[in-house]
Amino acid sequence: MTETLRVAVIGAGRMGADHIQRLHQRIHGAEVAAVVDVDLARAQAAIEGIPGAVALADAEEALNNGDVNAVLIATPGFLHEDILLKAIAKDIPILCEKPLTPDAESSLKIVEAEVALGRKRIQVGFMRRFDAEYAALGSIIRNQELGELLMLHHQHRNPTTPAGFTNEMLINDSVVHEFDAIRFFTGEEITSVQVRLGKVTKNAPAGQHDPQHVLIETESGVLADVEIYVNAKFGYEVATQASFEDGIVSIGGDKGPYTRSAGRWGGNVTPGFEERFGAAYDVEIQSWVDAALRGEIGGPSAWDGYATAACCEAGVEAQKNGEKVAVKLAAKPDLYS
């Protein structure tokens, strides 16, 4: 049995660079063997101080490197399909940042390739499942501590968006996390999505309709809604309230320390996702490494990546027509049952 994962990190941008340092500094049982980026200078900068790691400009070269026995994909989503298919052919553990691929059709191809391999090798990077509060709420739901889950209310607020952040990206890059969270909490597939477009903030860039209200339904009839507001200015806030037969649970709300000074009271708002979910990323990657060393995955599967891609497609269609749009899914293979 492999005792150490020797990981090729493909993509050395914001997310990839963060994972490189995470693997090098905080994760046990893994080491960075290679870093790949089309900007070779960026890859070289990323491996500085990491003994034995090599910088490469080509993903296939990394996968063919005999010192590599696992891969972490942190490139833009449109590059994922080709890298995933090549990594599946190598039969090595794969951690793929979301999205699995940018659309349901190509995501299904990845699922089919993994089914043909005969075992699960892909873990998809939906880090919220590893957040302590998300895990606690998930446990309350599964154990029916407050009876049946009836409704979920989500708020997803970002301080601002980068240039070129389109309406579709509100669904594909932001609400995608809520789609996965709803599937995680309920243990069910999402059956329909509707998007309502109301009053627009003055802070939205030209061509972007912000905020939006997303209405979601699951197989058993659990209703969920998402306020997606990506130019909220005040900071980064992701919160959920779950309504049960016998109570309500809220997560992701305000946290201390709270101060009282000069006639005022208050606390701090997290500025971004790294601060809010940094610990969850650590738990996620450690779970992947531990599971990979056992020949398993330790989190969301390729099927989860495909299912959320299908939800996103329904969401983008619903943005455009304002109607309730059914989520179209292929039959679930036994591998993921």
UniProtKB/Swiss-Prot annotation:
Family annotation (Gene3D superfamilies): Dihydrodipicolinate Reductase, domain 2, NAD(P)-binding Rossmann-like Domain
Entry's Gene Ontology BP terms: inositol catabolic process
Taxonomic superkingdom: Bacteria
Keyword Transit peptide: no
InterPro entries to which the protein is assigned, alphabetical: Gfo-Idh-MocA_inositol_DH, Gfo/Idh/MocA-like_OxRdtase_C, Gfo/Idh/MocA-like_OxRdtase_N, MI/DCI_dehydrogenase, NAD(P)-bd_dom_sf
Keywords for the protein's UniProt record, in alphabetical order: NAD, Oxidoreductase
Chain coiled-coil ranges: none
Pfam families attached to this UniProt entry: GFO_IDH_MocA (PF01408), GFO_IDH_MocA_C (PF02894)
GO molecular function, one term: inositol 2-dehydrogenase (NAD+) activity
EC annotation from Swiss-Prot or TrEMBL: 1.1.1.18
Catalysed reactions, as listed in the record: myo-inositol + NAD(+) = scyllo-inosose + NADH + H(+)
Family, as annotated: Belongs to the Gfo/Idh/MocA family.
Biological role stated in the UniProt entry: Involved in the oxidation of myo-inositol (MI) to 2-keto-myo-inositol (2KMI or 2-inosose).
Subunit composition and interactions: Homotetramer.
Protein name as it appears in the record: Inositol 2-dehydrogenase
Organism phylogeny: Bacteria, Bacillati, Actinomycetota, Actinomycetes, Micrococcales
